[in-house]
Amino acid sequence: ITDQKSSGRCWLFTGLNVMRAKAIAKHNLGSFEFSQTYPFFFDQLEKANLFLQGIIDTSSKPMDDKMVEWLFRNPLSDGGTFTGVADIVSKYGLVPKDVMPETNSSENTSRMAGLIALKLREQGLQLRDLAAQGVKPAALEKTKTEMLSTIYRMLVLNLGVPPTEFTWTEYNAKGEPVSTEIYTPLSFLKKYGDEKLIDNYVMLMNDPSREYYKCYEIDYDRHRYDGKNWTYVNLPIEDIKEMAISSLKDSTMMYFSCDVGKFLNSDRGHAGCQKLRLRISYGYFFWHEQEATYPKFCQWLQSRHDSYGRRS
């Protein structure tokens, strides 16, 4: 069992667990985890770049423009989707957990996230001021790079220095050493992970508010500026259930997200039963047959990510 502690990294833990299960089975490994801190480091750095570049791209728009407002309200977060796992891991690779372990800030992200967000907002205002003064794009890009070096340093202080090369010993299920080799994060990904995450997986969604059997893309919901937006095929829940059952039967890990924040009783581990208790208390259900309207009322904005067969 892996534990994200007090952080929003469920998407990352789940994505890594899908690859982790395959690595353990393929190489007959004993106790093994990929480092969650390593890709999280670069996820935060890439999101900082996404924000700053977004500020440059919208610098001609007024501060009360909806996009500009949204950027300053959401400079970065520790949440994400499988698209982020694919984009970050394919670019930066993977390392074992003992090479870059958890830190207090990775397990409790709120303080670090708040400080980085504060710095990014400050930097965003500086970039807008420079753009208003007529500074050329090349100079803005240079300033942005300098700003990112500050964010990099903040991440190092909180998460540690990401390794570029490391020596690691593989142990089998009996605890016996099998091999000791020198790796880079990308060579480790090639041997123990999945180099083609972007090509090998498709995201599915049950979104009752939109037409089924079509592909949808959520603009600016990505982890890298040059990455892929959150893109999914919208299917009826019955179709997704069939795929989930098939994944369980053939022991293939299936990454999934669900909107567990609604009517959740975390003490009892129940989801949905809270609706019944609310009806007993209040005399009526809360939108029990109107889930298709949830997105329109901003009632369906955050999901929880897990993998079948292994808790995240």
Where are these regions (language model features)?
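Structured alpha-helical subdomains that flank or immediately precede key functional sites
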Residues: 1-6, 12-299, 312
